[in-house]
Amino acid sequence: MRYTSSPLLASKTPVWRSKFVVAVIALGFVVLGARAAYIQVVNNHFFLHQGEVRYARTLELPASRGRILDRNGLILASSVPVPSFWAIPEDVDRDPTKLKELSRLLGIPLAELTKKLENEDKSFVWLKRQVDVDVAKKVTELGIKGIYQRKEYRRQYPEGEAAAHVVGFTNVEDQGQEGVELTFNKELGGKPGSRRVIKDRLGQVVEDVGDEIPPIDGRDLQLSIDSKVQFFAYQKLRDAVLLHKARAGSVVVLDAQTGEVLALANYPSYVPDKRQNLSGEQLRNRALTDTFEPGSTMKPITVAIALENGRVTPQTLIDTSPGKYTVTGSTITDTHNYGTLTVEGVIQKSSNVGATKISQKLSAKEMWDTYMSLGFGQKPQIAFPGAVSGRVRPYKTWRPIEQATMSYGYGLSASLFQMAHSYTAFAHDGEYIPVTMQKTDQTASGVRVFSVANAVEIRKMLQMAAGPEGTGPKAMTVGYSVGGKSGTARKQVGKGYSTSKYRAWFTGMAPIDKPRIICAVMVDEPSMGVFYGGLVAAPVFSEVVQQTLRMMNVQPDLTVKPQVVTTTVEESF
């Protein structure tokens, strides 16, 4: 029996009402169908986008950092792919046995690992980055759900501590933190790429969406450094520091013709990829960041200024008797009474009195102008972090005693690198040339500070100073003529100078007629009773110069072994 034919129902329910209910239900199905069609056909891009927002991820494709090479193409720093581990906390299998083993393998305390996995609101958390391959294999074999592996890059430094202060290091994000790694971070780092993907709730990539942008690897960088010279210089410096129980030391070797830095070594040093217990003493690139009063290594510059201004000649006589001299109430002394010396003799014997009397023939401005021309008091123009300017006060503030002490290296400060750089004006026939950390085959062209003739005269004086009758005969080396100046400077303590703490210097060049290299050595606080630059720093200079010239295939210019003496004339300081 039909609904409309039932007498009971027909009397109680109007026909139009039942039809209305059926119509509403039918209309509902029509609306739902239309909406479904709209979503799937007309406006599907909006909902696809919403889905992507919830499950799409942009994966970074890491760029491989460029290599750092020495001048001969040997690797100083390179990147190797290494695995890193991350997790989706809410998905991690909490098996206590597996987590304990994971903690052991990754070297993470169990409490710390547990804390990392507690925040289940996070969809990504690093567990351990840059893990050794054998460890990564064992972690993978644990098969812990919710823990995943990603490829990253880690730097390797084959030369270790010998080149650490040159190369520097990167952090876990592969960003340069020190040295060349920091200076050229942008060029070495390249540009990472990206990949847009859809991931399921387990973090697995199920689909690529959009175009992949490939990474652009960093470019390789070739330095001027010769890794063999660098290693040898570091070894000899380390030996000297340990022998004399010194606090620290530095060596700088420059190519006198191109201005290239061939070696820059410091001790103490550090291993760049093992920095767990790194101290500030190890990290400091002392050759560039530490400034000192250079002592007698400034005397050749004082004499060169006087020669250039026509106030003296190499044979001008200077009376240094009786080995002391008073300037405005302050007494300047020599270690001996040298009597009357030629200007050459002032350098050879390292007379403070002689240097003072020569400086009195000059104006403060003449000295200051030349100091500025040689880079003193200015930050070195070299692409390297931490290089400092040193200190030279404006000449208008100089008192007579200050002008006097500056003539032999007190009252101003410079880094070892600045001292080596200033001597390019002697080695390069009077031109102060730019220096560079990058390889170049071009002979440098610089700013003329001294005439060729005066530069040659200074080189002759430096050869005398490094000879048997000078203060630095231990700088002499087999097969090559050398010239240089030793320096011994008392260290400042408070407002005065220590009577027991010294810095020993030696700065020079070889071969002397046409120098190919400049070498500067500084040893800080030798404490075994020997502290003169001619005894502590000069032997390091000798060994480094001889080995470097051999490595450069420079022909010896001495036919016989030089007369290397075992005693040194005491220098004034």
Which role fits each region the language model picked out?
Residues 2-6, 77, 199-210, 251-296, ...:
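Beta-lactam-recognizing serine transpeptidase/beta-lactamase-like catalytic domain environment
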Residues 1-275, 365-375, 386, 494-495, ...:
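Periplasmic/cell-envelope proteins involved in peptidoglycan metabolism and beta-lactam response
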